[in-house]
Regions:
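Histidine/cysteine-enriched polar flanking segments
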Residues: 1-333
Length: 333
């Protein structure tokens, strides 16, 4: 497996040089951590490749490409593998700046999906569905988690029905069962939010088992939001007809950051070859979350990385990463 990341131009979510430098150090720490487990390729904007190489250190491939931002999960392709023969392809979602938000720019980022597929040497299949990689999560056995406020967002896909969205997604991913969450975390609807990405709320640990963000403190609006979401997950069945086992992952103790409701979440992790790169927040619950993920993934090394600078820019570790599966032996692409 190979990780793709990005180092773009100054982003709207990073207003000052200090914020940019802090975020880029965090981005680099994630890339270096993943490099311990698998190859890493980072896309860098024009004139930024040399600085990226200096920041990332040896062993990380840097490729110069025009970029608007750096959220590779959302602007990159979603790689898929055909079960019968292991052949790979890439879904190139239509990207429009998370619903054409006024602060977003996507002239270059809308092309990244196809460019990354070309770097990987696989065929890219362009889909007319406006979607981002952080807006879905699959179990590898036919089930996909979605959010009503993302795929059915009128600023993304005006007039699209749930059935139409499912048909497009199932055709591309090879899934057959969608579990729709009603919304995302409160903080994700702020100015630089995605309007409900699932990858900060819930993720499959393995088929039949979902980790779900919970907010123990009733003073935070996500306390009720998470109760609703976990209720939906517990009532759902996957593509095999199994009820989902829901493993609750309590949020960090901090409730507000810079006057806004915190959406710090341990769910936004990255699985790599033999490892789990886990968000950390210098919080008392960091150790509890790391222990929980070690129990869930006993054959992987769990490595916490301070994700606060990444969250300050609008996302987490999963949001800045995109995995390319290794080709099956004897196949091309």
């Amino acid at each position: 497996m190979r990780l793709y990341g990005a180092r773009g131009a100054r982003r709207a979510t990073l207003a000052t040089e200090a914020e940019l430098a802090s975020a880029e150090r965090a981005w680099a720490e994630v890339a270096r951590t993943v490099r311990r487990f698998e190859p890493v390729t980072v896309l860098a904007g024009p004139g930024r490749a040399e600085g990226a190489r200096a920041l990332l250190g040896p062993g990380v491939d840097v490729v110069e490409r025009p970029l608007d931002d750096a959220w590779m999960r959302d602007i990159g392709p979603t790689f898929v593998t055909r079960a019968e023969d292991g052949a790979r392809a890439a879904l190139d979602w239509t990207f429009n700046g998370w619903g054409a938000q006024e602060w977003a720019r996507w002239e270059h980022d809308a092309k990244v999906g196809g460019e990354v597929a070309a770097l990987a040497g696989v065929t890219a299949y362009r889909t007319g569905l406006v979607n981002e990689g952080g807006g879905l999560h699959v179990d590898g056995e036919g089930t996909v988690l979605l959010t009503e406020t993302v795929q059915l967002d009128p600023d993304r896909n005006p007039g699209l029905s749930r059935a139409e969205a499912e048909a497009e997604i199932h055709a591309g991913l090879g899934t057959s069962k969608a579990v729709w969450l009603p919304r995302g975390l409160t903080g994700d609807y702020g100015r630089f939010g995605t309007r409900g990405h699932v990858d900060i709320v819930a993720a499959f640990a393995r088929p039949g088992v979902v980790v779900a963000h919970t907010q123990p403190d009733p003073a935070h609006p996500d306390h009720e939001v998470c109760k609703e979401i976990t209720g939906v997950l517990r009532a759902a069945r996957d593509a095999a007809g199994r009820p989902l086992e829901v493993v609750e992952v309590p949020a960090p103790t901090v409730l507000e950051v810079d006057g806004a409701w915190a959406d710090y979440s341990y769910i936004n992790h990255y699985l790599c070859n033999g490892g789990v790169v886990l968000c950390a927040f210098d919080d008392p619950r960091d150790a509890e979350a790391a222990a929980l993920f070690r129990r869930l993934f006993p054959d992987r090394t769990v490595v916490p990385v301070d994700a606060r600078p990444v969250f300050a820019a609008g996302g987490g570790i999963h949001c800045i990463t995109q995995q390319e599966p290794a080709p099956a032996r004897g196949t091309r692409g």
